[in-house]
From Swiss-Prot:
It is found in: Cytoplasm. Keywords: Cytoplasm, Meiosis, Phosphoprotein. The keyword DNA damage does not apply. Its main location: cytoplasm. GO terms for cellular component: cytosol. The lineage of its organism: Eukaryota, Fungi, Dikarya, Ascomycota, Taphrinomycotina. The gene is mug35. Residues 126-156 have a biased composition (Basic and acidic residues). Residues 126-176 are annotated as: Disordered. It comes from the Eukaryota. The modification Phosphothreonine is found at residue 132. GO terms for biological process: meiotic cell cycle. This is Meiotically up-regulated gene 35 protein. It comes from Schizosaccharomyces pombe (strain 972 / ATCC 24843). The keyword Transport does not apply. The modification Phosphoserine is found at residues 127-128, 141.
Length: 234
């Protein structure tokens, strides 16, 4: 391994992973938010995987992997420039890919997150034009359907044009609407909007603590006229 490659792997020195405190200061703010607030408290490590919601078995498998993962075994697979003054490095280990961000302005390295490689392959295959729609449904479903963005899933659940034409009335509730899809879709929507908002705030010098404080203030103002109570510890 070259010295340059060793430097790129520096923030992976947090592994093997034993507790969430090891993530302090070495992950991106968005990943920190995912681990602290989006993942279940007793399965916080699930927040590290950003392209898939894990089953109980997959969560246990990931935890065992993270506890024994040696970053020196990671294989470098590529780099990119997701935004100005940021270089992205991608490493592969086991069934996961690790993305590391190098911020050129302050020369800091942050772990962006993990990707489930199998899920990436399914999504890539689903979006390619090599297969017919019938082949896609047979080979990829139902996983591809559950991983589609919220609004795409919503459209798939709507009545067909023929149904609408025959009844002349829109169906108020989709026939096959799943509460699970709705929840996951809203999770994605909140995460996407939060990420965009944080990017703007961080570029203007706002810290993570300030960002979270303003989010809390926004929630409190919304709860003023509600019988719901906002948690005391956000």
């Amino acid at each position: 391994m070259t010295n340059e490659r060793h430097d790129e792997l520096a923030c992976l020195g947090i592994f093997p992973l034993k507790n969430p405190k090891q993530l302090d200061g070495v992950v991106t703010p968005i990943l920190q938010l995912r681990v602290k607030f989006l993942a279940p408290t007793d399965r916080w490590w699930e927040g590290l995987v950003i392209n898939k919601d894990l089953s109980k078995e997959e969560s246990e498998e990931l935890w065992k992997f993270l506890q024994s993962f040696d970053p020196r075994s990671a294989k470098f697979v590529g780099r990119g420039t997701p935004e100005d003054h940021v270089i992205s490095y991608l490493f592969e280990a086991g069934k996961y890919e690790f993305e590391v961000f190098f911020y050129q302005k302050d020369h800091s390295l942050k772990l962006m997150g993990l990707y489930d490689k199998t899920q990436k392959q399914l999504l890539r295959r689903d979006s390619s034009g090599d297969l017919t729609s019938t082949d896609k449904e047979r080979d990829v479903s139902p996983v591809s359907h559950s991983e589609k963005p919220y609004w795409d899933r919503y459209d798939l659940d709507q009545p067909s044009n023929q149904d609408v034409e025959e009844s002349r009335n829109l169906v108020q509730e989709p026939k096959h609407r799943s509460k699970k899809y709705d929840r996951l879709g809203l999770d994605e929507l909140v995460m996407e909007q939060t990420a965009s908002l944080w990017k703007i705030c961080s570029r203007n010098g706002m810290s993570v603590d300030e960002f979270l404080r303003f989010i809390r203030m926004g929630l409190e103002s919304n709860f003023q006229h509600s019988n719901q109570v906002i948690p005391t510890h956000f």
